[in-house]
Amino acid sequence: MFAKRNETIGIFNTIPQGWTEISEAEYITLRNTPSVEVQREFKLKELKDRVNRLKVNNSEMYITSSLGFKVNADTNSLENVNTLIDLNANIFRDFDNKIHKVSLDDLKTIKSEIQQNTVNLYQQKWKYEEIIKKASISELKELKLNFEMLDFKQG
């Protein structure tokens, strides 16, 4: 007879106490399912890949600046803002491709907000890592890796 208890499966002559009888088909499916440790590694890799995709030129990686418009917040955008600061530029193109006249202080504000959002992204990643390290197989399957970007808008 085939049986399972929590995430453990086995074959028995009689079903031990605390175990539940399962069909041979379910046993085969469960036997071929990677262990919780392997599935945690898969989920951690998925998390790492998701964060890396967000950091590099990604349309999901934007913030609402305290200056009142959306700003791309990936690593390429941070580099672009640094260049604008170095050149003392007074024009900035936002997430929606609108042009804004800005001061050096405005650019420094944008830079700081992008940096704060990057820290926020990593803090969320670290929380997910802790969740994944403790999750069961069913919890791993249900876990969605969604990230919230910061909103610096006043009011």
Describe these PLM feature segments.
Residues 2-155:
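A preference for well-ordered globular domain cores
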